[in-house]
């Protein structure tokens, strides 16, 4: 509240009427208006200064509080208490200064609504103590308490510890206890947090049993104690009993989900908080699940096993014991936190038809066993006969000069050599006929209805930003790439395009189902395509429809189709062909059911529930092994592009797609610049640059090479290990440009081992020639994926 408001002036109550009045004050202040005559006046763009003597007795109902980042208060002797309600609306507050005032008490929860507070100055007030709870949860860079009549007691032990550890600038203040000497010399032998001991059953319990836990609390000045039951509601019926110093907890009718769940007892006193966690072992029989084999780096037969104790595993192949080798072996993925279920793969390195058959996984523990079987086919039999059958032998006619007097019998009327010659002649005729048909088809005037130009103009928002790299890379002059900051003049190379024959699909074979999204080029649909592959009558595909029918758009469409036809790799999204019958023109791609990698990472990260908005989320974050597998697959696709001398220019997780079995492929359908518009920085009219993924030479000189792609891949690695966060998310585009060009690097993500961060930093060398090659990066990631490092997130 305010004291001593004046009448007849633009006082506190008048400019508190609304944000428009506050804006007027800010404009006047910036224009050099006369000094503010009231108790609190605007300071800077988002600050407030309250310095008139005795004008405040609380901070309740500060005007424009929701936008304040700095609050300075001085000479307010009537301001004696700081409580929760005083700072309720100051969610953006960073700096708070209350000096030379009458402040005597700060409530333990006073700063609950100011989580961004980083600097707190309460010097020269009347504070005798300050609870550790007051600063709990704040990331304070500076805490100033000098000039207060502090009373030395165990309640200030936390502040003494800050002084010992050099936190918050406390050591420089050399705090004094009123009449008792320096705070650093305060005796603290008896100042300890509570001591906890939780009694758990010695033996494991069975599903359906009841478990009684007891928490014994010891220590001085006990204030509160209790149980943390967040993870337990679905695992048992919970009943609490007792109170300090002995707390009881009954878990009735326990389920197998209780395994690996933390049961935590906590207690607090004026010194601090203590917690002790225990786990209860619930025994249950083994269970197993097998899934269809998927092709990743190697082939993988995914499985999930559960049981307590952990079951032993054994594989059978066609009913016989499968002996594991370096080519066929069991690999477990990183276990999810607080779960007994283990996920893994039976890895098969380059399996052939010999490995086709029935695979059975047996799992057993002392309480039971389980098995599951699945048929796997990795390759068709290349032989037309059974290799185990005897090979037929043709006998030559018996020599008439034989000494034997037996009659001679000829096996065939037609000599074998004549049969071979006739067969070869027929084969040659068929081959030449087929070749002539293909040449005639590809040599005719193309089905796009346009003639190919010798030099192609800059593209405008193609689905995949993949470009042929001319000698030494490519760069954009200021007049180039008006349609997109990522495109330059692409010179057609006969080595890559002269023999390209784009597959044409009949429109009647495409049945659109529903719209997946829309980009600058047009719309993308989920469709059902018939007669696309010989082994399937119909299959789901993604269809991109061209919005414009202009000549330049059709040329871009043709060039993109030819380019995509040339790209055939297991980690590049597969392009099936085009449909040019009628309008609009269509491109047909492989359908990746899980969408783009960025959304997939966010929905499988630690913040998935926060981002889901009530929808179902994945059971837990991706583990280290899975993150490494994702990164290695993206690197494999980039190795392939680099081998063809293609520069991507827009490599990011938003431009990668995820399919069944955690298969990741490079490529998008041109929607990323619309869906992820905040990832691009607009330069001029239409140019959009992904500056947060670009190296200094690309930002400053528009130079794009395979080395600039390596830099971008390092940023993609950072995205993967932050579960899809935007690089430099805390900075504006211009601030991010400054950081990149000045040599600053993204910080190591919490989920990232040092070995992976070393790879990132190798990708971010300022000199392009000093960066790792993408081939070397891929090899290192593959090695880490096969043997993930042991990494503990001590902060998580």
From Swiss-Prot:
Result, substituting residue 577 to R: In CIPA; loss of function; processed as wild-type but shows significantly diminished autophosphorylation in both neuronal and non-neuronal cells
Site, Breakpoint for translocation to form TRK-T1: residue positions: 486
Site (Breakpoint for translocation to form TRK and TRK-T3): residue numbering on this chain: 398-399
Oligomer and partners: Exists in a dynamic equilibrium between monomeric (low affinity) and dimeric (high affinity) structures. Homodimerization is induced by binding of a NGF dimer. Interacts with SQSTM1; bridges NTRK1 to NGFR. Forms a ternary complex with NGFR and KIDINS220; this complex is affected by the expression levels of KIDINS220 and an increase in KIDINS220 expression leads to a decreased association of NGFR and NTRK1. Interacts with SH2D1A; regulates NTRK1. Interacts (phosphorylated upon activation by NGF) with SHC1; mediates SHC1 phosphorylation and activation.
Disorder noted: Congenital insensitivity to pain with anhidrosis: Characterized by a congenital insensitivity to pain, anhidrosis (absence of sweating), absence of reaction to noxious stimuli, self-mutilating behavior, and intellectual disability. This rare autosomal recessive disorder is also known as congenital sensory neuropathy with anhidrosis or hereditary sensory and autonomic neuropathy type IV or familial dysautonomia type II. Chromosomal aberrations involving NTRK1 are found in papillary thyroid carcinomas (PTCs). Translocation t(1;3)(q21;q11) with TFG generates the TRKT3 (TRK-T3) transcript by fusing TFG to the 3'-end of NTRK1. A rearrangement with TPM3 generates the TRK transcript by fusing TPM3 to the 3'-end of NTRK1. An intrachromosomal rearrangement that links the protein kinase domain of NTRK1 to the 5'-end of the TPR gene forms the fusion protein TRK-T1. TRK-T1 is a 55 kDa protein reacting with antibodies against the C-terminus of the NTRK1 protein.
Job of this protein: Receptor tyrosine kinase involved in the development and the maturation of the central and peripheral nervous systems through regulation of proliferation, differentiation and survival of sympathetic and nervous neurons. High affinity receptor for NGF which is its primary ligand. Can also bind and be activated by NTF3/neurotrophin-3. However, NTF3 only supports axonal extension through NTRK1 but has no effect on neuron survival. Upon dimeric NGF ligand-binding, undergoes homodimerization, autophosphorylation and activation.
Entry protein name: High affinity nerve growth factor receptor
Organism: Homo sapiens (Human)
């Amino acid at each position: 509240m305010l004291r001593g408001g004046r009448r007849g002036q633009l006082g506190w109550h008048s400019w508190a009427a609304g944000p428009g009045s506050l804006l007027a004050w800010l404009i006047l202040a910036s224009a050099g208006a006369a000094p503010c005559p009231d108790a609190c006046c605007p300071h800077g763009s988002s600050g407030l200064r309250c310095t008139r003597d005795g004008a405040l007795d609380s901070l309740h109902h500060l005007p424009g509080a929701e936008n304040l980042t700095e609050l300075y208060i001085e000479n307010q002797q009537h301001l004696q208490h700081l409580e929760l309600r005083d700072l309720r609306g100051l969610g953006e507050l960073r700096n708070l200064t209350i000096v030379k005032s009458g402040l005597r008490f700060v409530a333990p929860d006073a700063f609950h609504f100011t989580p961004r507070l980083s600097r707190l100055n309460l010097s020269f007030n009347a504070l005798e103590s300050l609870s550790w709870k007051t600063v709990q949860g704040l990331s304070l860079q500076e805490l100033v308490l000098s000039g207060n009549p502090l009373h030395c007691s165990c309640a200030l032990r936390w502040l003494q510890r800050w002084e010992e550890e050099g936190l918050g600038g406390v050591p420089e203040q050399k705090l004094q206890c009123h009449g008792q000497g320096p705070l650093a010399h305060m005796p603290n032998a008896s100042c300890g947090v509570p001591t906890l001991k939780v009694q758990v059953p010695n033996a494991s319990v069975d599903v359906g049993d009841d478990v009684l836990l007891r928490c014994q609390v010891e220590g001085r000045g006990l204030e509160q104690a209790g149980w943390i039951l967040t993870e337990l509601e679905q695992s048992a019926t919970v009943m609490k009993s007792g109170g300090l110093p002995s707390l009881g907890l009954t878990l009735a009718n326990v389920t197998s989900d209780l395994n690996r769940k933390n049961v935590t007892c906590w207690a607090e006193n004026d010194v601090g908080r203590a917690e002790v966690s225990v786990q209860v072992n619930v025994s249950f029989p083994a269970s197993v699940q097998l899934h269809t084999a998927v092709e990743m780096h190697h082939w993988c037969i995914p499985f999930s096993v559960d049981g307590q104790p952990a079951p032993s595993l054994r594989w059978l192949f066609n009913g016989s014991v499968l002996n594991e080798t370096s080519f066929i072996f069991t690999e477990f993925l990183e276990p999810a936190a607080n779960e007994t279920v283990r996920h893994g793969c039976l890895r098969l390195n380059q399996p052939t038809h010999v490995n086709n058959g029935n695979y059975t996984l047996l799992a057993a523990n002392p309480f039971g066993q389980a098995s599951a079987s699945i048929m796997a086919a990795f390759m068709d039999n290349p032989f037309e006969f059974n290799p185990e059958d005897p090979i037929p032998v043709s006998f030559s006619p018996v020599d008439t000069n034989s000494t034997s007097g037996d009659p001679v019998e000829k096996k065939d009327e037609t000599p074998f050599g004549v049969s071979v010659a006739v067969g070869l002649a027929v084969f040659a005729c068929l081959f030449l006929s087929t070749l002539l048909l293909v040449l005639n088809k590809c040599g005719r005037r193309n089905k796009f209805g346009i003639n190919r130009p010798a030099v192609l103009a800059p593209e405008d928002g193609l689905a995949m930003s993949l470009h042929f790299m001319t000698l030494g890379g490519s760069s954009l002059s200021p007049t180039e790439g008006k349609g997109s900051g990522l495109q330059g003049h692409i010179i057609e190379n006969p080595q890559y395009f002269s023999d390209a024959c784009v597959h044409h699909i009949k429109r009647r074979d495409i049945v659109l189902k529903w719209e997946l999204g829309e980009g600058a080029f047009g719309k993308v649909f989920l469709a059902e395509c018939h007669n696309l592959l010989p082994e399937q009558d119909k299959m789901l595909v993604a269809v991109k429809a061209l919005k414009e029918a202009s000549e330049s758009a059709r040329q871009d469409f043709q060039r993109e189709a030819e380019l995509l036809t040339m790209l055939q790799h297991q980690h590049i999204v597969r392009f099936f062909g085009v449909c040019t019958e009628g309008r609009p023109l269509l491109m047909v791609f492989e359908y990746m059911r899980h969408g783009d990698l960025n959304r997939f990472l966010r929905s499988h990260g630690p913040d998935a529930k926060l981002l889901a908005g009530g929808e179902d989320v994945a059971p837990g974050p991706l583990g280290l092994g899975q993150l490494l597998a994702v990164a290695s697959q993206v690197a494999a696709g980039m190795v392939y592009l680099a081998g063809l001398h293609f520069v991507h220019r827009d490599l990011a997780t938003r431009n990668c797609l995820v399919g069944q079995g955690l298969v990741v492929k490079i490529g998008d359908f041109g929607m990323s610049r619309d869906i992820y518009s905040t990832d691009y920085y607009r330069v001029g009219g239409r140019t959009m640059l992904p500056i947060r993924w670009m190296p200094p030479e690309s930002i400053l000189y528009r130079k794009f090479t395979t080395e600039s792609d390596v830099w971008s891949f390092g940023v993609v690695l950072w995205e993967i290990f932050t579960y899809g966060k935007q690089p430099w998310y805390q900075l504006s585009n211009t601030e991010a440009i400054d950081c990149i060009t000045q040599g600053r690097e993204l910080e190591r993500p919490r989920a990232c081992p040092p070995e992976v961060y070393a790879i990132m930093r190798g990708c971010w060398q300022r000199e392009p020639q000093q960066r790792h090659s993408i081939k070397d990066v891929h090899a290192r990631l593959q090695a880490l994926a096969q043997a993930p490092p042991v990494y503990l997130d001590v902060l998580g």
